[in-house]
Amino acid sequence: KAKKGATSTVVSVDIGGGTTDVLIVDKGEPRYLTSFRFAANTIFGDGYSYDSDSNGFVNKYKDIITNQLETNNLRGLKAVLKSVLDKRVSTDVIAFLFSLASNKEIKKEKVEINFAQMLADDNRGKYVVILFYVAIVYHIAKLMKAKGFDMPRHMTFSGNGSKVLNILSTN
């Protein structure tokens, strides 16, 4: 006897930094696997080969976080941030900003510097994340229609790039 949902179409979306990988499972069998170069670096990267000076997220939050590090006497981390900023690679800056939420030194000082929460609280910034996910889902829908697949019953997201979903909702 088939398990519940075994006959439905399921889509697994693995979002990395540089690519998004999609697996379509239909009637319990893997039917289609594809990958495309539209992933987390699309949101947080340098785009069109510019540098971090043109990245809106870096520009908006670098001074805020630098000031938080200075105010809380976290000069070592401030120096690391300056070093990362000097390299002008947006993905490195963004990765560092995300890492601060779990940084041992920051936790030891009982300071909260949570870049993901800052983004979640930024109503304008959320639109970028929404558009990113809508673009991925739209691309998958067009692909599935072209290949003759039914609308999926479930869609799962995995990979480091999928963590930005938490900016939209913690559920």
Regions found by a protein language model. Give the residues of each.
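Nucleotide/phosphate-binding catalytic cleft detector across ATP-hydrolyzing
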Residues: 1-12, 162
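Short loop/turn elements that form and flank the Walker-type P-loop nucleotide-binding site
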Residues: 6, 18, 151
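Conserved catalytic-core segments centered on acid/base and nucleophilic motifs
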Residues: 9-26
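Phosphate-binding glycine-rich/basic clefts of nucleotide- and phosphate-handling proteins
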Residues: 24-169
